Amino acid sequence: MVSIRPDEISAILKQQIEDYDKSVSVSNVGSVLQVGDGIARVYGLQQVMAGELVEFEDGTEGIALNLEDDNVGAVLMGEGLGIQEGSTVRATGKIASVPVGDGLLGRVVNPLGVALDGKGDLGTTESRLIESPAPGIIQRKSVHEPMQTGITAIDAMIPIGRGQRELIIGDRQTGKTAIAIDTILNQKDQDVVCVYVAIGQKAASVAQVTEVLRERGALDYTVIVAANASDPAALQYLAPYTGASIAEYFMYKGKATLVIYDDLSKQAQAYRQMSLLLRRPPGREAYPGDVFYCHSRLLERAAKLSDAMGKGSMTALPIIETQAGDVSAYIPTNVISITDGQVFLSSDLFNSGLRPAINVGISVSRVGGAAQTKAIKKIAGTLKLELAQFDELAAFSQFASDLDAATQKQLGRGKRLRELLKQPQFSPLILAEQVAIVYAGVKGLIDDVPVDQVVQFSRELREYLKSNKPEFIEKIQTEKVLSPEAETMLKEAVAEVTSTMLATAN
């Protein structure tokens, strides 16, 4: 007969009582009613928030966007091939966030902060919400520091300041991305963190940009956020906000940052696709009613912070692609009204051989003038006017048989200025070189140089200054002012180069 030992039974009961785990997990769950085209309709999820992350049975993540009477409309941030009707969906209680920190520099990530470059873990410990409020009025300061692009035409006539939003707009294949990449390359040794956001682009194009930045040593201070053409619409829609969050981290640490959104037309299309599939009412050009807010809340995050906030800045260069030069379409007009100016690229100028193909007449920088360095501001004042007058005269002179000497001189000056502003891709110029080139053109010091040799003159003048007058370059780079002493040095250099060129030509 088995003897029952009460002490043993009581010991076991005590042990079980002590080990009893009282924690209760409450999860908000629902089930899939319908799925397809990157959208899922979910029944249940009673307590879900707008914009909350939800997790499907197969591990795919989504965002709850439409909260309706009897269902929730969620967009999928993955393929979602394993999601079926009746699959369970769990609300996570979290809003989409992205890892931030120095570990992101030199890396390629997707809009959720997942590395795409095969270099392993990002090594970051902090994260930021993808959607963050823009800095308030008191936290801001007016734009007053220059953001040099290295492109003479922009730095002289359409200057950009730190904390500004400057739109780059033009048809496809007019060099919009090239201007953005040149600007990143020009930030070398300037202690500026750059974020390049590729939205809906070919994976090959993103790889090419990454390679260009790596070859020229610019990837060390750049983060690339890529939502390729093959990615779901939800990721293409989120990509710019991710880029802004990464830049904000550095901005609030007191650093200057530069963000390029390439391009917001594709983000608007992705948002339109999501909205129409969620059965939201369409507006003009079938875009949803809040597409303006979609872009304004993104671009308002760019700012120059006050001294109390650490003096950081975020400069935004959004890119918009137009169709046949139509800047009066819905998305272009929206973004033009949000930004502080635009650089308009013309396909006609591009095809005529003018690179960068900037149409100076309708390009403008509304706040950059306050940030422009004194050296180039002093000499570039008349440049924009002279080029605008030249364009007008050139159109008129096609119909005139004989022109007076003054008109011929003005046409000749305009042609030479046009040639001076030509610049090959991936070769940004430092401030001193820009000052030298613009000075020579505006002051009429190269009126005797044949038009077809102006590009050569520009190259030789830069080489001459580097080898024979390094003190001029040093003076301009440090003082940022064209002093009488520096002006004398520059005049001597221009005279020397032009006389040598004319002598060899003869």
Swiss-Prot record:
CDD domains attached to this UniProt entry: ATP-synt_F1_alpha_C, ATP-synt_F1_alpha_N, F1-ATPase_alpha_CD
InterPro entries in the record: ATP_synth_asu-like_sf (IPR023366), ATP_synth_asu_C (IPR000793), ATP_synth_asu_C_sf (IPR038376), ATP_synth_F1_a_nt-bd_dom (IPR033732), ATP_synth_F1_asu (IPR005294), ATPase_a/bsu_AS (IPR020003), ATPase_F1/V1/A1_a/bsu_N (IPR004100), ATPase_F1/V1/A1_a/bsu_N_sf (IPR036121)
EC top class, as a word: translocase
EC number: 7.1.2.2
Gene3D superfamilies: 2.40.30.20, ATP synthase alpha/beta chain, C-terminal domain (1.20.150.20), P-loop containing nucleotide triphosphate hydrolases (3.40.50.300)
Site feature location: Required for activity: S363
Bilayer topology annotation: Peripheral membrane protein
SUPFAM superfamilies, A to Z: C-terminal domain of alpha and beta subunits of F1 ATP synthase (SSF47917), N-terminal domain of alpha and beta subunits of F1 ATP synthase (SSF50615), P-loop containing nucleoside triphosphate hydrolases (SSF52540)
Gene Ontology terms: cellular component: plasma membrane-derived thylakoid membrane; proton-transporting ATP synthase complex
Chain sites annotated for binding ATP: G170, D171, R172, Q173, T174, G175, K176, T177
GO MF terms held by the record: ADP binding; ATP binding; proton-transporting ATP synthase activity, rotational mechanism
Keyword Disulfide bond applies: no
Xref: Pfam families: ATP-synt_ab, ATP-synt_ab_C, ATP-synt_ab_N
Keywords per UniProt: ATP synthesis, ATP-binding, CF(1), Hydrogen ion transport, Ion transport, Membrane, Nucleotide-binding, Thylakoid, Translocase, Transport
Compartment(s): Cellular thylakoid membrane
Catalytic reactions on record: ATP + H2O + 4 H(+)(in) = ADP + phosphate + 5 H(+)(out)
Similarity annotation: Belongs to the ATPase alpha/beta chains family.
UniProt function note: Produces ATP from ADP in the presence of a proton gradient across the membrane. The alpha chain is a regulatory subunit.
Subunit annotation: F-type ATPases have 2 components, CF(1) - the catalytic core - and CF(0) - the membrane proton channel. CF(1) has five subunits: alpha(3), beta(3), gamma(1), delta(1), epsilon(1). CF(0) has four main subunits: a(1), b(1), b'(1) and c(9-12).
Protein name, entry field: ATP synthase subunit alpha
Species of origin: Synechococcus sp. (strain WH7803)
GN (gene name): atpA
